[in-house]
């Protein structure tokens, strides 16, 4: 064994979680190293070439507000941008971009190379070193030993990876990367409760083999409506490519069903549990038998490649069946598969074995992030990576760690769900998972999280100055709207010009903006646009004014819940001695060890009656094991 150095924080893996973890730890001043099997796989997109989407776009904005990298990378490498759910309320608006996967990798690799205090190593980590229940370092396949105060596991689907295509399988990570089998055994030996999950990816096909005249075109939003992910991005945006939509048909479904037993998922070869909200095409055909078609989104992988990604058509069927069912689709009759679809099975940890800081309860100083924690998706991974890296660094430096309550962010909701409720299948963030989604909008992520990022050392001076300036602009415009009166004649003229039924009378601009038919641009046509108010800020201001009553109600809910969050539970509380609890509640509370009464009430199987009993016991005084 060759001792090659010591670090405050070591990050294993340089995918979306590992990048944010390494960047966050180094930004906080911790001496940091990130290990990856290949420098050419940093920030790889082994599945869809896109960032954002419903709820995921909010996670990216939150990452950016805290000082993360993903938003800037997406803004620098996007090909097409669309705001999803524009016909619905602002709570579910979601930015999504197609990205150039090669340029995204290059951006992220360079971002890490430019990060001060961060060492980048191409090496496979085969084991962690643990002493007296605390991580002490890692060992590589070349017998290199590196000491560390804290380690972040961000292994993606490489950990114990196994790829399936029909009845063929082989040990591998995604995109031909090695499987990290030795590390799995080391983590098991350290006492981590591991399990098997599964995910999949569709075929990549050659652009020239698609008849686009048979597909529906899916353009991006008009250039003047485009919004960046990062609060720091000022560059003008324009769409560069179009996406397309194809549809399966009854013949496609017949081919799949006739060969369903050749799928390793249905033939019993795959043990791992797949994602509920991103099913394979064979799953869709079986589970939704009454549907006669399913959409397939045809997306470019980059500007300098002819590979096209078939979103919505992941599969693990044999190659001959893939050829047959893809070619049964209108526009795909002559399809050329460049990379076949496959399923991948991998190891991950039971997230209820983690603290809300993402530190392991089994091995102190060891943190998890991304798919290792049982989630799916680049955005979920990156968000956890930032939190794990931040907390690993603060732990190593002897500082207080950050716990984000679920009412602060989608990231806080995600982590609370993982460590409190656990997962039965790969976890995907959705707006419906948050009870505070009107407050946790993508447009106000900076207001919610940038001060926290500043307090914990992640937000640098340029971002902080930008945040303060933005808040000053919004505050000034809110005051102007509150103080400005519109004459009835002027308002009616503006409404008639916009094709709207004229209002009865004028009034204070702020009060008028509460009306559903009146928009900020309409008012601005009368009183002028506020100084430095962009369309993006105008939309944010309008949302806050129009929904002020609902937001205030949600704020009251948050304050009520916060009282339970402040009722702390001793780590050694003797649940088994509390006879008023149900047996299920006692078992789950003893296993998960919630930090406070609020978290206890969110554990599945713990009823309001159990929470009341626990509250009484806590008020009565110490009850320890």
Provide a role label for each language-model segment.
Residues 5, 141-150:
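Core beta-strand elements of the Rossmann-like FAD/NAD(P) dinucleotide-binding domain
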Residues 3-17:
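Beta1/beta-strand and adjacent pyrophosphate-binding region of the FAD-binding site
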Residues 38-40, 56, 83, 184-323, ...:
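An anion/pyrophosphate-binding glycine-rich loop and adjacent beta-alpha core
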Residues 309-375, 403-416, 534-588, 593:
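A glycine-rich dinucleotide-binding beta-alpha-beta segment and adjacent secondary-structure elements
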């Amino acid at each position: 064994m060759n001792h090659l150095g010591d670090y405050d924080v070591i990050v294993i893996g340089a995918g979306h979680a590992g990048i944010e973890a390494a960047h966050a730890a180094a930004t906080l001043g911790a001496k940091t190293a990130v290990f990856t099997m290949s420098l050419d796989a940093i920030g790889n997109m082994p599945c869809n070439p896109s960032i954002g989407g419903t709820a995921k776009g909010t996670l990216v904005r939150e990452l950016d507000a805290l000082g993360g990298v993903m938003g800037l990378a997406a803004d620098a490498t996007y090909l097409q941008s669309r705001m999803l759910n524009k016909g619905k309320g602002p709570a579910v608006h979601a930015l999504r971009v197609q990205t150039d996967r090669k340029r995204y990798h290059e951006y992220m690799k360079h971002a890490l190379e430019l990060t001060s205090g961060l060492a980048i190593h191409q090496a496979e980590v085969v084991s962690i070193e643990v002493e007296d229940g605390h991580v002490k370092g890692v060992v590589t396949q070349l017998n290199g030993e590196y000491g560390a105060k804290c380690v972040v596991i961000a292994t993606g689907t490489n950990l114990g990876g196994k790829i399936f295509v029909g009845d063929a399988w082989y040990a591998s990570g995604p995109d031909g990367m090695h499987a990290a089998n030795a590390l799995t055994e080391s983590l098991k030996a350290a006492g981590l409760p591991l399990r098997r999950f599964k995910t999949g990816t569709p075929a990549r096909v050659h652009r020239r083999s698609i008849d686009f005249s048979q597909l529906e075109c899916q353009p991006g939003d008009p250039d003047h409506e485009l919004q960046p992910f990062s609060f720091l991005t000022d560059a003008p945006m324009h769409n560069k490519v179009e996406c397309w939509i194809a549809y399966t048909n009854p013949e496609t479904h017949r081919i799949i069903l006739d060969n369903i037993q050749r799928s390793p998922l249905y033939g019993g070869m795959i043990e791992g549990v797949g994602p509920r909200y991103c099913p394979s095409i064979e799953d869709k055909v079986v589970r939704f038998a009454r549907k006669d078609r399913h959409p397939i989104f045809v997306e470019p992988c980059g500007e300098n490649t002819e590979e096209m990604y078939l979103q919505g058509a992941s599969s693990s069927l044999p190659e001959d069946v893939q050829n047959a069912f893809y070619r049964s689709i209108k526009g795909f009759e002559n399809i050329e598969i460049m990379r076949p679809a496959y399923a991948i099975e991998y190891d991950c940890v039971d997230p209820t074995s983690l603290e809300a800081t993402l530190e392991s309860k089994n091995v102190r100083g060891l943190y998890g992030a991304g798919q290792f924690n049982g989630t799916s998706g680049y955005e979920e991974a990156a968000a956890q990576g930032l939190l794990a890296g931040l907390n690993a660094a603060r732990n190593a430096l002897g500082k207080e760690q950050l716990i984000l309550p679920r009412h602060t962010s989608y990231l806080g909701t995600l982590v609370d769900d993982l460590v409190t409720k656990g997962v039965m299948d790969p976890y995907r963030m959705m707006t419906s998972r948050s009870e505070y989604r009107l407050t946790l909008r993508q447009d106000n992520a900076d207001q919610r999280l940038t001060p926290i990022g500043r307090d914990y050392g992640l937000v640098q001076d340029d971002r902080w100055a930008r945040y303060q300036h933005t808040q000053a602009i919004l505050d000034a415009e809110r005051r102007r709207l509150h103080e400005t009166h519109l004459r009835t004649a002027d308002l009616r003229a503006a409404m008639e010009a916009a094709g709207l039924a004229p209002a009865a009378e004028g009034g204070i601009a702020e009060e008028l903006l509460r009306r559903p038919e009146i928009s900020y641009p309409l008012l601005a046509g009368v009183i002028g646009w506020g100084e430095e108010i962009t369309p993006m800020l105008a939309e944010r201001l309008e949302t806050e004014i129009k929904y002020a009553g609902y937001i205030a109600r949600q704020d009251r809910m948050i304050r009520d819940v916060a009282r339970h969050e402040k009722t702390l539970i001793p780590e050694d509380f003797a649940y088994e001695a509390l006879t008023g609890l149900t047996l299920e509640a006692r078992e789950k509370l003893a296993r998960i060890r919630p930090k406070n009464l609020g978290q206890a009430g969110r554990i599945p199987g713990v009823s309001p009656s159990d929470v009341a009993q626990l509250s009484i016991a806590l008020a009565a005084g110490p009850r320890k094991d």
